[in-house]
From Swiss-Prot:
InterPro entries: NADH_UbQ_OxRdtase_chain4L/K, NUOK/Mnh_C1-like
Transmembrane segments: 2-22, 32-52, 61-81
Subcellular location: Plastid, Chloroplast thylakoid membrane
E.C. numbers: 7.1.1.-
Protein name (database record): NAD(P)H-quinone oxidoreductase subunit 4L, chloroplastic
Keywords of the record: Chloroplast, Membrane, NAD, NADP, Plastid, Plastoquinone, Quinone, Thylakoid, Translocase, Transmembrane, Transmembrane helix, Transport
Subunit text: NDH is composed of at least 16 different subunits, 5 of which are encoded in the nucleus.
Top EC class of this enzyme: translocase
Main subcellular localisation: plastid
Pfam families per the UniProt record, alphabetical: Oxidored_q2 (PF00420)
Species whose genome carries this gene: Chloranthus spicatus
Catalytic activity: a plastoquinone + NADH + (n+1) H(+)(in) = a plastoquinol + NAD(+) + n H(+)(out); a plastoquinone + NADPH + (n+1) H(+)(in) = a plastoquinol + NADP(+) + n H(+)(out)
Highest taxon in the source lineage: Eukaryota
Lineage: Eukaryota, Viridiplantae, Streptophyta, Embryophyta, Tracheophyta
GO molecular function per UniProt: oxidoreductase activity, acting on NAD(P)H, quinone or similar compound as acceptor; quinone binding
Length: 101
C-alpha cells in the first residue's frame, strides 16, 4: 500500500475511535473505541518505521509493546466492567460515579 493510503486509513480509524470515546455512554463501547485508537497508533508506528529506516525495527518493536498493552486492557477492561455491572446494575459511564461511595 502507498503511504498516503495507510495514513488516511489510520487517521480514519483514530477519528472514529476518538469520536466514539467522546460520545459513548457505555463502558464496553468506550473500550472498543480505545482499541480502535490503539490500532491506528500501531499502523502509524509500523508505517513510519518502514518509511524512515526499514533496517531498524524500532517502530515495529514499540508496536508490539502497544499490542501487549492493548491485550492487557482487553483482558482486564471487561472484567472491571463486569464487576461494575454486578454491583451497580449499569454499565453507563455517566451513572457510575465510583468515587462517591
Amino acid at each position: 500500500m502507498m503511504l498516503e493510503h495507510v495514513l488516511v486509513l489510520s487517521a480514519y480509524l483514530f477519528s472514529i475511535g476518538i469520536y466514539g470515546l467522546i460520545t459513548s455512554r457505555n463502558m464496553v463501547r468506550a473500550l472498543m473505541c480505545l482499541e480502535l485508537i490503539l490500532n491506528a497508533v500501531n499502523m502509524n508506528l509500523v508505517t513510519f518505521s518502514d518509511l524512515f529506516d526499514s533496517r531498524q525495527l524500532k517502530g515495529d518493536i514499540f508496536s508490539i509493546f502497544v499490542i501487549a498493552i492493548a491485550a492487557a486492557e482487553a483482558a482486564i477492561g471487561p472484567a472491571i466492567v463486569s464487576s461494575i455491572h454486578r454491583n451497580r446494575k449499569s454499565t453507563r459511564i455517566n451513572q457510575s460515579n465510583l468515587l462517591n461511595k
